[in-house]
């Protein structure tokens, strides 16, 4: 073997072996238990970042561990390759998105291979290829035929200068990012998929996701947002019109003092015809980009419409106000306002001088609404026939009265809205719908799929090439002239079913059901928690759609989910002559000074600039604190980077990048290499004979098998990879101190090293692969079995007992493992140190904690 550890040399050799032998290519095998391990696939942005490396190292550790458990392991990889960044890069680089994307894929593919990830590259997919999106288009047409797809107008960001739709991230301070024109809201027709048809099932099945983090499940429950309430009908004074309002607090209905409606509500439009102030307010609201998330913090404003609503029970008239905090696309676009018992309504009423009435009070006292609304549930009062009822009784009594009088109905509502999948961008999968000459909209026939996205285009930064090219949209269906849809799919469409396509990526159908049902559901899914309410919800929804289409037979797409934490790094900047911050890479920091707690107090970069240190922040381009994985691999080797990633932090928590920690990981691998090379250089012909072992040799062997047990549990069940590494490091300390004098000494070291190679194989596979063979093991380590704990080795012949006198440790004694209290007490009392501390004292009490502690109380 090589005497010195040379990572670049051994990693190249091992990776060539994996490639030549197609080590990680798998097929279905009914005789083997399968394990499908999947990390969320990357967007091909150009280079891997450390967040990718952490995600994919975790996945690779799990996959390799399961392989050594004897399972048939699938670990695929691909590219989430449609999306807006490619369009922006194409505009900036004066190229088309396709070549930019494919170049990035090749570059990042090589980076993944350098890190030694054990992917089945024969299953590689890129979502921007027709071979992939053809089946997405086909499935969309099937959903349309089932009534799960529809088209309706919805609001978008519109640049009137460029006459184009803008993504939210292209709106900067209310203006177009390109020409600085104020952005307007415009209603245009868009395609939707009825995710709400699955809302109840998506919510209920969260309870079956035992292997998912509670935080993700809670976020999805809240996002789906099931509520039970009453939808009631209000009349409009002086008009024959009515409108509906939904509430989860019908117990407060008797306290309604005004009604708030969205600026886009039909009643607001009617009132605006004779109310210039209201008309101006409506225009202002329409041209603002208020999201649901912004409602909580923005200033609440409104204008009286001059209309009055008729209370459905009392018949009393209350004013109708148009308000900016009511959204037309959420609920009915109208809310009943009870300022006595809702803080937002209270603040609005105070601002505009509207009435505030209390109708709910605490069970054990009076209510004070002079300074703030009373928002708790309680007892109804000032509520006529409903006085004295508690929340539940009041809810039911008022609901029953509304239902009986035909003015309301009980209803379950969801916060979840149907999924708008239309995007007015170019670099996405074309939506496979056409409009015939007579205006009829139909799906593109299956024999005309895929609807190809032209890749040889010029990006002008203003309009999508397929919208600008009027000829592209022209087609024929069944001999009739037709126009293609020029919108493309939301890129969440591609990432909602890619996991299933990996099961049969070359199939001339969306999925091969036999293969899909062999591999699915995914056994372990790995990705960031930021995807909890978008990707992970669409992922679950799509799986149910695939199930109902007869393509898969499971209810959920993934059994277990691990959400890894972010990678942080030091961030530094200086102020340049223009007064602007210039962020400096940690790699360009020349010197630092630290206080006695290790905190950076001063830093200077390579150009002599004194820097401001802002602490550990998420690695990002904006703060220039990203560390290029490739630089680290070239400097230390892939195994070192992988080992640091697994050792530095539990997987769900943030990881602080410290090059000193990387250096420590590198030193550990070199120690392992040195120990193995020293062992290999000796005569190791004597086989292990447990019957010949001394007590010291048995103790060392016990450490080996305790480590096997701990690492197996840490990786397999707990997924605490950092403590698994720590356990092996501790074992290494024992092995380095152990003598290699006798044949049995060396036999134990040999057994230990053989185990260590397999324990570390998931984390540092190149080193483990190489040393496994150098140690004389037959066959490749990939085909070996995970080490098994020898339970007999864990049995201790003796125990080390701590002896305390009056609470202070005075001695440590070795006793037989099965020694009883009397014999332990006798040995302890006769220890020379104990005798010394008991001199002149009378023993009052002796407490024995079996196998651990002998405590003597004396005075």
UniProtKB/Swiss-Prot annotation:
Compartments where located: Cytoplasm
Keyword Magnesium attached: no
EC number: 6.1.1.4
Gene3D superfamilies according to UniProt: 2.20.28.290, 3.10.20.590, HUPs (3.40.50.620), Isoleucyl-tRNA Synthetase, Domain 1 (1.10.730.10)
UniProt GO molecular function: aminoacyl-tRNA deacylase activity; ATP binding; leucine-tRNA ligase activity
InterPro entries for the chain: aa-tRNA-synth_I_CS (IPR001412), aa-tRNA-synth_Ia (IPR002300), Leu-tRNA-ligase (IPR002302), Leu_tRNA-synth_edit (IPR025709), M/V/L/I-tRNA-synth_anticd-bd (IPR013155), Methionyl/Leucyl_tRNA_Synth (IPR015413), Rossmann-like_a/b/a_fold (IPR014729), tRNAsynth_Ia_anticodon-bd (IPR009080)
PROSITE patterns for this protein: AA_TRNA_LIGASE_I
Protein name: Leucine--tRNA ligase
Organism listed in the record: Shewanella putrefaciens (strain CN-32 / ATCC BAA-453)
Gene: leuS
